[in-house]
């Protein structure tokens, strides 16, 4: 049976691009899933901050390398100034350190530049998952995050239960509550309870922080599909 095509990215989204590579920036700006929602583009960290504050987007897509400045620093600034804006970062280098920096900035989605235009669908998958309110960390991102050294993490005040770990892992894979309930065979209310408990124990303010913190503590299997 053929899969039904994914619906287009909701066009009411206001999207900003900040890329140091002008060729990539130009290509993304005219790409079908992005162009209808694009409200501005920039190439530097300072320009990106100014543009976000002016345009008030609900999604920022940036690269790790910028003409001046640095993508993860831009994400941290935007997260502080406009916490409602979702953050998707495209990493030029596939290293544990860079993945850790992206997650430390609480990016809602992290993909590698090498995946753009390869047919793997990471960009489209990320756009759809973020539009649905999920987080997007492909398996290779989760693997590198779990492998990164974590010397500065304080000990957890309280251990997560197995069900809370299961739910946190599902959130890190981009699943919403309904899908998690179906996957684990539990009620929607039970999922919400586990999410709330896991957030409390991990000191997370939202689902993105919960997923990131669980990954960085090595609490979930990064190789789960």
Language-model features, listed with the residues they occupy:
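Conserved acidic segment of CheY-like receiver
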Residues: 10-24, 28-32, 41, 60, ...
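Short hydrophobic/Thr-rich beta-strand motif most characteristic of the beta2 strand and flanking loop
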Residues: 36-44, 51, 204
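Conserved phosphotransfer microenvironments
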Residues: 45-48, 58-78, 91-98
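Conserved phosphotransfer cores of two-component systems
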Residues: 53-55, 78-84, 105, 217
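A short, hydrophobic beta-strand element within the central beta-sheet of small alpha/beta folds
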Residues: 84-96, 110
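Short, flexible helix-to-coil linker/hinge segments that flank and couple to helix-turn-helix
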Residues: 100-109, 115-157, 162
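Helix-turn-helix DNA-binding segment
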Residues: 150-190
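Recognition helix of helix-turn-helix DNA-binding domains
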Residues: 174-209, 224
């Amino acid at each position: 049976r053929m899969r039904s095509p994914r619906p287009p990215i909701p066009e009411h989204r206001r999207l900003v691009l900040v890329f140091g590579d002008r060729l990539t920036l130009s290509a993304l700006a005219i790409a079908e899933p992005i162009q209808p929602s694009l409200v501005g583009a920039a190439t530097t960290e300072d320009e990106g901050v100014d543009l976000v504050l002016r345009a008030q987007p609900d999604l920022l897509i940036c690269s790790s390398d910028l003409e001046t400045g640095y993508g993860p620093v831009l994400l941290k600034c935007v997260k502080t100034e406009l916490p409602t804006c979702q953050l998707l970062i495209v990493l030029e280098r596939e290293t544990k350190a860079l993945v850790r920096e992206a997650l430390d900035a609480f990016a809602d989605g992290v993909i590698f530049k090498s995946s753009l235009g390869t047919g793997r669908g990471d960009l489209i998958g990320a756009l759809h998952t973020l539009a649905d309110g999920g987080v997007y960390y492909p398996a290779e991102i989760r693997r590198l995050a779990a492998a990164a050294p974590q010397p500065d993490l304080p000990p957890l005040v309280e251990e997560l239960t197995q069900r809370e770990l299961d739910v946190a892992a599902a959130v890190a894979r981009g699943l919403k509550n309904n899908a998690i309930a179906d996957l684990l065979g539990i009620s929607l209310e039970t999922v919400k309870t586990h999410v709330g408990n896991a957030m409390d124990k991990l000191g997370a303010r939202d689902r993105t922080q919960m997923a990131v913190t669980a990954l960085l503590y090595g609490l979930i299997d990064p190789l789960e599909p």
